[in-house]
Amino acid sequence: MTSREQLVQQVLQELQDAVESEGLEGLVGAALEAKQVLSSFALPTCREGGASPQVLEVDSVALSLYPEDAPRNMLPLACRGEGSLLFEAASVLLWGDVGFSLELRARTVVEMLLHRHYYLQGMIDSKVMLQAVRYSLCSEESPEMTSLPSATLEAIFDADVKATCFPSSFSNVWHLYALASVLQRNIYSIYPMRNLKIRPYFNRVIRPRRCDHVPATLHIMWAGQPLSSHLFRHQYFAPVVGLEEVEADGAPGPAPAPPALAPLPPPAKTLELLNQEPGLSYSHLCERYSVTKSTFYRWRRQSQEHRQKVAARFSAKHFLQDSFHRGGVVPLQQFLQRFPEISRSTYYAWKQELLGSGTCQALAPKEVQVLGELEQLPEEQMAKGLGCSSLAAASPSMVLMQRAKSYLEHCISLNTLVPYRCFKRRFPGISRSTYYNWRRKALRRNPSFKPAPALSTPGAPQPASVPEEALLPWKGEGGEGAGKATAGGPPAPHEFLPPKVPLSRWQRRLRRAARKQVLSGHLPFCRFRLRYPSLSPSTFWVWKSLARGWPRGLSKFQTQAPALGKGGLREAKEKQEKEAGRDVTAAMAPPAGTPLHVGASPGEDPGKAQGGPSGEGAMAQGRPHSRSLSSRPVAEAAVGGGDGQVLVMDMLATTKFKAQAKLFLQKRFQSKSFPSFKEFSALFPLTARSTYYMWKRALYDGLTLVDG
């Protein structure tokens, strides 16, 4: 019977023969055959044959490079072999000798070939690993290595895989990742306290690709030739074992090395220096340590002094926003007494930003009462709700967060779901992820929550609910129009329509300025979203269509409906200029059984907002009431005018685009080939990076993005 060593030698020989073929097709075929051979026997879990392990020797070079932040009471050992000794080090750690190094090499080659896409793009740490690969051939960070394209990295990967088939080759970072998957163990990659600019990419815990149990951890150290006090060149890997393991194995004590670790030169603890001396400048630091300017400022942002300044600035800004939403701005003197570290110019810049954003909405008496009750919560209850101490909850930012969380929980307890855009207007300092986390927890506490239907028939009994004035989640959504009903039908009941509030002077001025710039053609969409975040994207496209003179009156929805008369077309053409600033929600969700209404400006005559008898009003009345609610708003919005058509098509395209992106990520996740953000953004360029990582985190947490 063929022995284990002969089978491994045969597998390696077949892989070496396949290297000569062009491309990776022959090598992948040989890897599939090698997998069948190697799967016939598993790696042993303990030493076979009862032979005593080889005499352990401490690697003095690796010991002098052993970093201070690595695990204590451990020693790097010396290995015998060729190349970078990665597989020899793993064999010594697991079985006490280098007898299984060739088998580990063969299994690693098979792993890297059969899961090539995973190691290049699919895994969570792929970006960190690829960055480490860029720096593995140099000791300093350089622009040339940082800008290596993905095609070059794939070529390096293929060359490394082919070279790994030969025992004298050198290993790279992805060999560590593949070896961790082969051994089903974590690998603690210990990197010396040298090459500080690239050290974070190498000094980390590497986890296997898939593991069904809680994995143990192997410690492997990067060792090599020291070049200076802060530089070294990697040459080989050294196994690191604990002192108690050496004593338990009965191995003779390491005679050449002293029992205690020799004192190492102190590393460059720049972050601690910045915490001790906040005024430390880069010119003083670069004389003592090899630190680039970008690294220095990144560490400076992490220093304690900078974090305190950022926290104080955050609290001051949200205190000013809170006072502004209450109906008035705190005077400068009172603001400086409370926050003396904030400058006068910063105060006026924030004040002008608040006044120009158009978010100042008058609070209704009921809402003031609700917010007043939320403010009267005791500090212990606030601290309990946010999971922090009462001293931390007393800060203005914690008070704002507690008020926002209590407001959202109160709305859900009243069977009302506040959309994020309305919640953002009320509490601009709360992020989207925080809002959805709070909403998910509040919905779990209220299992009987059922949101009220958006449309209902006039004859159906209305459930008892809290008056909308107590919550006012939709008050800030109104456009310039007040929403008038068209002729040809009875006016809609008041309880079916969302409350409308006329726009303030600042909002009208803001919309006029934005509309003028869009119509002039000098404001692109990206700059429009940055300069006017309170205006919806559909408003931009409506104004853009007016500027370009697009024929928006004809659509596939209108071709299926009766043709408009000449008078109706003329009136619709004259109304396009006035309908550009109307409220979006008024065209999206008209009540069932009522005719479509179009927006009109506050000073416009209601009669002008109506279409002709043979135009929009007649078409809206001709719709049967048995029609489904899902298609009714789409058709009516398209018939009612160009604004509704552009808005509906924009919303449908956005919804379909997001659904396709979610389905794409979910399918790739199920097929174990999750795409990187670069690949994902090439297919879905309009999806933000934060949205991609939010969906990725949800999939890895076991959630489902798309049902069905």
UniProtKB/Swiss-Prot annotation:
Q: Which GO terms describe its cellular component?
A: chromatin
Q: Which GO terms describe its biological process?
A: regulation of transcription by RNA polymerase II
Q: Where is the composition biased (Basic and acidic residues)?
A: 568-582
Q: Which residues form a coiled coil?
A: none
**Region: Disordered, residue numbers:** 473-499, 561-636
Q: Which SUPFAM superfamilies match?
A: TrpR-like
* GO molecular function terms attached to this record: sequence-specific DNA binding
Q: Which family does it belong to?
A: Belongs to the vertnin family.
Query: Could you identify this protein by its name?
Result: Vertnin
**Native species:** Ailuropoda melanoleuca
Give the gene symbol.
Answer: VRTN
